[in-house]
Amino acid sequence: MKEVIAVKEITRFKTRTEEFSPYAWCKRMLENDPVSYHEGTDTWNVFKYEDVKRVLSDYKHFSSVRKRTTISVGTDSEEGSVPEKIQITESDPPDHRKRRSLLAAAFTPRSLQNWEPRIQEIADELIGQMDGGTEIDIVASLASPLPIIVMADLMGVPSKDRLLFKKWVDTLFLPFDREKQEEVDKLKQVAAKEYYQYLYPIVVQKRLNPADDIISDLLKSEVDGEMFTDDEVVRTTMLILGAGVETTSHLLANSFYSLLYDDKEVYQELHENLDLVPQAVEEMLRFRFNLIKLDRTVKEDNDLLGVELKEGDSVVVWMSAANMDEEMFEDPFTLNIHRPNNKKHLTFGNGPHFCLGAPLARLEAKIALTAFLKKFKHIEAVPSFQLEENLTDSATGQTLTSLPLKASRM
């Protein structure tokens, strides 16, 4: 298992709320320390848009093959590890292209087109259960269940087992915690074993009887004569499930938070013009996706970032800060769904490792927000809501555990 870089020692936020809305910290780092060395973690930290983009795309100087990482996902147990042939986050081109191609079979544009009606049906069902005039917990009612149900459905597993998937994902994506890491690792190993034992028979069955789902697509996937074994498919779906669920759930919950607290007029504007929803989703990804970061290892000595970097140095790029760079985005600390270049955000990365699941996350968010906007004309915050008490650590930063709101059709 790789050494996990303790990024909390770099940020040193005093409250969960401060980490959830890290704008002051991002502004300070962009203005005062755009490329800076952090002695405690022995890392170089990069914040400016062009520098972050350079590190993510220039694999000849900044490699994904590394001994340290900021990502604490999954476990190093036999059942919970990522198969070597799809370790796309830990490889550079040309190896990376082959590994990514194997995985990309599950995320083709054709697949997305086929999935759209299914996602629409699930979103409509969840929103159909909400009553206007009453208090709705948007996390429990939509942001949390939608991605889980969608992923379970797209993978072709029985709908009755969806809640099991939620439990496993929550555990496998627990963040790094230096004080409790031994306990966290044990929980992850148990979850990985339970998941593996549950899914393996389903994969075996789908090899015999393929269907229109992700598991069957992975079983058919072939690049240069290489295919997945049943074992590899099980472990691969664990990665897909976790990444697909966490990202979308986070995006949906934070979008509703933003509509309630960042700019209350945006909801009404979207309600009156649903064509603006895709733009709003992009701005939420730029403005309200908290602290996203990735790490790379310096491949050879260079001064491309204006400092002397040595081979083997660890570099952490902060995409969230890059999304707030005023040299790229005008008035960056303001929510603006009409921003002409908001799709240039780096939330899903850049270069060879651009997030494979980005189109699915965008599609789910667009469908869910549109369906909600069609049903409810107005939303308002619940005065008793305390943000600090409703946040928890996750692999994607501070995650909302609850977000009550009042919605009305009038």
Swiss-Prot record:
Swiss-Prot/TrEMBL cofactor(s): heme
Q: What happens upon changing T396R?
A: Loss of 15-beta hydroxylation activity (for progesterone and deoxycorticosterone)
**Location of this chain's protein in the cell:** Cytoplasm
The effect of Q398S is: 30% of 15-beta hydroxylation activity (for progesterone)
Its EC number is: 1.14.99.-, 1.14.15.8
Binding locations of heme: C355
Q: Which InterPro entries match?
A: Cyt_P450, Cyt_P450_B, Cyt_P450_CS, Cyt_P450_sf
Q: According to the UniProt record, what happens if one changes S394I? A: 30% of 15-beta hydroxylation activity (for progesterone)
Extract the GO molecular function terms from the UniProt entry.
heme binding; iron ion binding; monooxygenase activity; oxidoreductase activity, acting on paired donors, with incorporation or reduction of molecular oxygen
Keyword check for Metal-binding: yes
Can you state which reaction this protein catalyses? reduced 2[4Fe-4S]-[ferredoxin] + progesterone + O2 + 2 H(+) = 15beta-hydroxyprogesterone + oxidized 2[4Fe-4S]-[ferredoxin] + H2O
Provide GO CC annotations from the record: cytoplasm
Q: Which UniProt keywords apply?
A: Cytoplasm, Heme, Iron, Metal-binding, Monooxygenase, Oxidoreductase
Q: Which family does it belong to?
A: Belongs to the cytochrome P450 family.
* Function comment: Has the capacity to hydroxylate certain steroids in the 15-beta position. Also hydroxylates progesterone in the 11-alpha and 9-beta position.
How is this protein named in the record? Answer: Cytochrome P450(MEG)
Q: Which organism is it from?
A: Priestia megaterium (Bacillus megaterium)
Which gene underlies this protein?
Answer: cyp106A2
